């Protein structure tokens, strides 16, 4: 029987839930996600969790009591979506700050033993650091002792550099210890692009091939393919001839500045129109991982933008994980997620900390 009941706020497609769902001591009772398609994707992967597909502002105390009945929530996980901090105006800043206050409101109502609040690294410097100070002060004001740390998913077996702020609060004494890296110098080698997606068939712009080209020849692939006979969503985005020419001209790790002048795009940042490295982990992926004009996302072997399945792999979603909606929505679900392997590392340490309270 599970010892700890969990609620996931701003759940997205369930990347953070994933790690807790894999430990029998945790029982995820409910999740909240405002976007309909994303909530459907969550429910397809976590069918036993009550999904509350609504604005968090609508989660009243009465509604929560109705859903949870007499069950106590021991742990709340999640973090408001916070992309593009540098472009936020004052009104948007206020809206984002309101989401943190809603998180605090739910904590106040349910009074869990602990919470895990995750967010992008930019939150530390947003508004010259004052927003993060305010968030910490608000959580401390309702009796939580806090610890926070910047974790890079690449250090936990994810084939991608992806930094996330992990803020952990406990009522009273906080015995949470952050997971030690498992990959890096002196540890297991980082999982590279080749390790992570090299078994998926070569496809060109606009092509589909939902099969495996090789055996699962490393630990990461064995994990990704454990419950799957054939992959899905391995479709290359269709691009025009000029972009295909650009992608085919670039070598491993090169960007638009390395292109001949006659085909070099005149606009775009330095990491746009850029190939990833085959023998290194990926840079941070976003919802734009199929759009070379917006991010570094060109496949180093196949000279094309990434397929949805490849994006999911770079986030460490196993091949049986289901995404829902349009292709753009699926990329949003993947690009905004907490990598499952990172969530597993956090969940194990959270279990230890909760057990130490008993």
Spans of model-derived segments:
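Conserved beta-strand scaffold positions in the cores of enzyme catalytic domains, especially
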Residues: 31, 51-53, 146-150, 284
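C-terminal target-recognition/interaction regions appended to catalytic cores
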Residues: 216-358
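Short, Lys/Arg-enriched, disordered terminal segments
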Residues: 1-4, 356-358
